[in-house]
Amino acid sequence: MNLLRKKSVESMVAQATPLKRTLKTFDLTMLGIGAIIGTGIFVLTGKGALTAGPALCVSFLLAAVCCGFAGLCYAEFASMVPVSGSAYSYAYVAFGEIIAFMIGWDLILEYALQAATVSAGWSGYFNKLLEGFGIHLPVELTAAYGTTPGVTTYFNLPGFIVVLLITWVLSIGINQTKRTNDIMVMIKLAIIVLFIVCTVWYVNPANWKPFSPYGWYTFQPGSTKPMGIIPAASIVFFSFIGFDAVSSSAEETVEPNKTLPRGILYSLIISTVLYVIMTLIMTGIVKYPEFAKFVDAPVAGVILATGLNWLAFVVNLGALIGMTTVMLVQLYGQSRICYAMSRDGLFPKFFGEVNKKYHTPFKGTWFFGILTAIAGGFININILFELVNIGTLSAFIIVSAGVLWMRTTQPDAHRGFRAPGVPVTPILAIVFCCVLIAGLNWETWVRFVVWFALGLIVYFAYGRKHSKLGAAEGSASAAQSGIAGGDQASDNADAPDSLVSFES
């Protein structure tokens, strides 16, 4: 039983794909920005400001540096192994099957939980937008049970519906997905630039003092919750999750060995610049302790402080569009990873069946889309969202370690992009990821271990038995045994009778 059997780079690249290649550098950059910019600006900046103060911009930079180093490693792997599956496929080549399965299992949870979490934030902004037109949904249908303290809620209906609508868009073809995402990202960027231009004049530098009230990492008296730049970076790291989903589009990308690295890096750079500018403006307009009053809608609080009430509607619209693209890219990435795992036999064939009309993994897309919609509708995601962070950081560590390993074991393999500064770059990526993981609470670790344990059960119960690589190795071994047996029989037939009699 070889749990660490590996796929070769050549076999991965040579396999035919029924998916349609239409994505170019611009589309991939828009895909990355669509995944990154959303929840971070419109939701997490409030919680981050309370944790780090005005130094939140440093927290964003720290998280961005971590993602930047990891992004360089992703870019190299994407140019070397341009197939669907992202970190799952890279781990299969570098470390073997069981590691690949566990990373794939981890990413499935990451994408599902992030989409479900974002659907909760989307619902909040959607309800505010409706209220502006005098439309009020029943409170019980505005959020999952237990989401809002002191308010009786049972089901997040808006979030449930939007996830199903996004699933429909994803299922009917990559061209429709590309157009939808490109248009929404351009609108979102225009609204963010408008916000920056209109609010920068209200910044009061006095609000940036003290710049780092909690230092890098500290505990306040009577509290078990860490405060400071590093804990805030662990929180806002959620904002950058999604660029890795770009690499899942390899089999739908034109010249993936060139365009994938560009799409990953361009989207990270653009998003980081916007995040830092936004956080400096927001903490410059509103003193950081004041974000406690509107922690779930920090941008709305900033607009209130400026008196630019007309901007509220525009920003609400931008938030809705921003979070819609995040969900779209997460659900897209999830379906492509499941497709890759199914194609390798580690998941049932159902998930890998490509619709002949739409050229998409239609059934798998709808299966996980419905599960994600149900999770977003019924489950209080607040207690689980840090699982997204630890899952993503684990994938980053595996990919970064994989680049180190492949540079050592296959130095001459073709790479359309080579990460600069190896081995320093992947080592720094691993170190930064470990630092951010250290900022997460122990409950997150427990849940993560439980999910991994479930993954091991699924692998040994199904994946190991149905692995196509395992079946191929078994057939090759049987054929080799047959050849050896045939050779032995031939030798015996040609031997003297006395020798044959003696050996038998």
At which residue positions do the language-model features occur?
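Membrane-interface "cap" regions at the ends of multi-pass membrane proteins
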Residues: 1-45, 50-54, 61, 68-72, ...
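Helix-loop-helix junctions that connect adjacent transmembrane segments
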Residues: 14-19, 56-57, 134-159, 183-316
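Extracellular loop-to-transmembrane helix junctions
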Residues: 20, 41-148, 227, 267-270, ...
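Loop-to-transmembrane helix boundary motifs in multi-pass membrane proteins
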Residues: 20, 25, 154-160, 254-275, ...
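Membrane-helix boundary/coupling elements in multi-pass transport proteins
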Residues: 42, 83, 106-124, 235, ...
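Membrane-interface loop-to-helix entry segments
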Residues: 123, 154-208, 264-268, 385-398, ...
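Hydrophobic alpha-helical segments of multi-pass membrane transport proteins
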Residues: 128, 191-195, 330, 338, ...
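C-terminal membrane-solvent junction of multi-pass transporters and transport-like membrane proteins
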Residues: 151-155, 350-362, 396-444, 465-473
